[in-house]
C-alpha cells in the first residue's frame, strides 16, 4: 500500500536548542531562537526542494534538470559558501523560503579529531 497525500502536512519547526547539561548556556530561557540576520520573516507553506549547499552552481544544476524553486522552500546544507549567499541565490531564483541545516556528515565528530 502507498501513502496518498491529499492535503499539505504542516510541520512547525522548533528552533530552540536542545538542553545539554554540560553546557549551561543551553538552559537559559532568555536566549533567542536561531535566525539569519537581514532576511525576511513570515509563515510559508510550500513544496520543499533540496539544493545541496545552495551555491549558484547548485541552483543552475536544478534549473538545467528542469526543477524550479520558484514559490517553493529551498533546503540547503551549511557549508560550501556563506549562508548569506544561500539566501541571495534562493531569492534570485524565486524561492518563497530557505531552510539551512547542518549535515552531520559535514561537521563535528564525523570529520575526525582536530
Q: Where are the regions that the model predicts?
A:
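A conserved hydrophobic secondary-structure block that centers on an alpha-helix together
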Residues: 51-114
